[in-house]
């Protein structure tokens, strides 16, 4: 699939929108992602596989949202959030395709658990492990981006106008 065209379609339909203040919400979204992941782990350990499945997906959702916010966009569709991850991060070699595939699988398992009462220990485990990988990578990417931005803002740190001096 051509993710650039699909990204443009999401923008045209207003399922993705630019939002200048989004960059100020990155930390908040990442905190929500971490909280959801902790809840998913606790639920799994208690045998609450339905809630673990759901919380694991939402951990990934909020992690992806933090990444999207870091680029100045806001999603209005779970599907377009996935499209944005593929276009803005996978297409540039920052995220592996499998991480977004896992997020899409997690969304399907979340929908089954939430709307059809169809869930299992195996599905909960899959979502939980996928969420751990996704959140770890999101944190890495956001930490690197924050450090680069911080260095550009403070030239004495060894960066000037985006280049090492």
Q: PLM ranges: what are they?
A:
Residues 1-165:
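Terminal alpha-helical segments
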């Amino acid at each position: 699939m051509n993710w650039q065209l699909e990204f443009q379609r999401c923008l045209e339909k207003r399922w993705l929108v630019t939002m200048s203040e989004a960059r100020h919400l990155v930390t908040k979204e990442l905190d929500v992602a971490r909280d959801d992941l902790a809840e998913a782990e606790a639920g799994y350990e208690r045998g609450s596989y339905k809630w673990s499945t759901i919380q694991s997906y939402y951990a990934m959702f909020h992690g992806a949202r933090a990444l999207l916010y870091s680029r100045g966009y806001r999603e209005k569709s779970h599907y377009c959030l996935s499209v944005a991850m593929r276009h803005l991060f996978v297409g540039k070699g920052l995220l592996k395709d499998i991480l977004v595939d896992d997020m899409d699988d997690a969304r399907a398992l979340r929908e089954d658990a939430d709307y059809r009462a169809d869930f299992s220990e195996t599905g909960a485990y899959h979502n939980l492990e996928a969420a751990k990988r996704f959140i770890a990578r999101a944190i890495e990417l956001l930490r690197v981006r924050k450090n680069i931005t911080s260095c550009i803002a403070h030239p004495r740190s060894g960066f000037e106008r985006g280049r090492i001096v």
